[in-house]
Amino acid sequence: MEAPAPAETAGCEELDMDVMRPLINEQNFDGSSDEEQEQTLVPIQKHYQLDGQHGISFLQTLVHLLKGNIGTGLLGLPLAIKNAGIVLGPISLVFIGIISVHCMHILVRCSHFLCQRFKKSTLGYSDTVSFAMEASPWSCLQRQAAWGRQVVDFFLVITQLGFCSVYIVFLAENVKQVHEGFLGSTPIVSNGSDLSHACERRSVDLRVYMLCFLPLIILLVFIRELKNLFVLSFLANISMAASLVIIYQYVVRNMPDPHNLPIVAGWKKYPLFFGTAVFAFEGIGVVLPLENQMRESKRFPQALNIGMAIVTVLYISLATLGYMCFRDEIKGSITLNLPQDMWLYQSVKILYSFGIFVTYSIQFYVPAEIIIPGVTARLHAKWKRICEFGIRSLLVSITRAGAILIPRLDIVISFVGAVSSSTLALILPPLVEILTFSKDHYNIWMILKNISIAFTGVVGFLLGTYVTVEEIIYPTTAVVAGTSQSPFLNVNSTCITSGL
């Protein structure tokens, strides 16, 4: 992906907070109508417009869509292909990608319809679900419409904090490999004792690296305004783009004979594929905020189709080529398969880790701004800032605890994807369309289509959760990504790698 010009990129990054804000403030929407907003309401076939001073451009929207969908999930897709098969995997990725994009379009269409029906200028995800329940023909749902908003907010918080836990595991595993690769290339002065030599080379537990990142991440999330992260965010985007280019050239240049790869993997592993794939495609949370902020919102479907087409091609190509290159040795992140004795490929892990480190603060923004205002609302002004920093530190510690409990990158990605991403991306949007249009625009084919999509999401949710939990409790492998996955630190060990 070609990097945008610095001036326009600056505009993109400075708008990050404004783009994310509708995701935060929607639960405080008072439901009152505005006369000026009411006068600007137009038929459903048309779209509202923002002036050039406040809206974001088509290119900025496209960049934000790419940023919202490209992360650690992309690097975990080669292992997902292994869990599905070299033929079934790519086909399933196309299928899940098409359904995910369709659900994004569903959400935008329902938001437009409900905006006009309830005379609102814009609606976010939570309010779209709430007003869809209010517009439904069933009185029991109408009375519980407020619960729709709370359910979406809950899954948004769980999803974003889950992303943050994934990032901590990713950072720890990649930095661990770089550190051990550096130690492995450094001559060691030995007294001739094999035991001493073994102790020098013994690996540090993955959780120690997680602990080292904790204060750095806490300091990062103390930056309350995303626009203040512009320079870091811009450098992070460049770093991740450069890393992907290097990864592509490696897998293409080192491609073995692709024969003898399983066309279809065992069915017990397919739920792990589903969780990882849905995790990767779960960018639905940024769709309505972006559409609401776009200057020419009538062009948003075009931006969505172009952006997600790029994302899907990127996903399928890297997933397939990565699995064909590393075969059964593929790990939870393809970066962990790159050579440890060449600094070009070690730099990929450093660069991508830097990008993920900065992205942590962006993903953390949503749950922090949903939780913190409700907790600090009744506090005295002088205590609010202290309490806010305490809550931010606590939330970061919670994400680290989640990473410690599930220190396997592949499993934590599949678990978050199955539990929360499938709910937001596949289950809720088709149900929202049924609730929104069943009263005035009843269509049996629309009902059947949406029930099928929601059923797929529910099955993936149940099977994916079951298989990942089973894998957590009864792991099939004792060593993942080259690190011991024992449930606790070996505090009795007397041999710890130096240089940490």
From Swiss-Prot:
It is a multi-pass membrane protein. Highly expressed in hippocampus, hypothalamus and piriform cortex (at protein level). Expressed in epithelial cells and both inhibitory and excitatory neurons. InterPro entries: AA_transpt_TM (IPR013057). It catalyses: L-tryptophan(in) = L-tryptophan(out); L-alanine(in) = L-alanine(out); L-proline(in) = L-proline(out). GO terms for molecular function: symporter activity. Glycans are attached at residue 492. The keyword Transmembrane applies. The chain crosses the membrane at residues 84-104, 151-171, 203-223, 228-248, 270-290, 306-326, 354-374, 411-431, 444-464. GO terms for cellular component: lysosomal membrane. Belongs to the amino acid/polyamine transporter 2 family. Interacts with CRYBA1. Uniporter that mediates the transport of neutral amino acids like L-tryptophan, proline and alanine. The transport activity is sodium ions-independent, electroneutral and therefore functions via facilitated diffusion. This is Neutral amino acid uniporter 4.
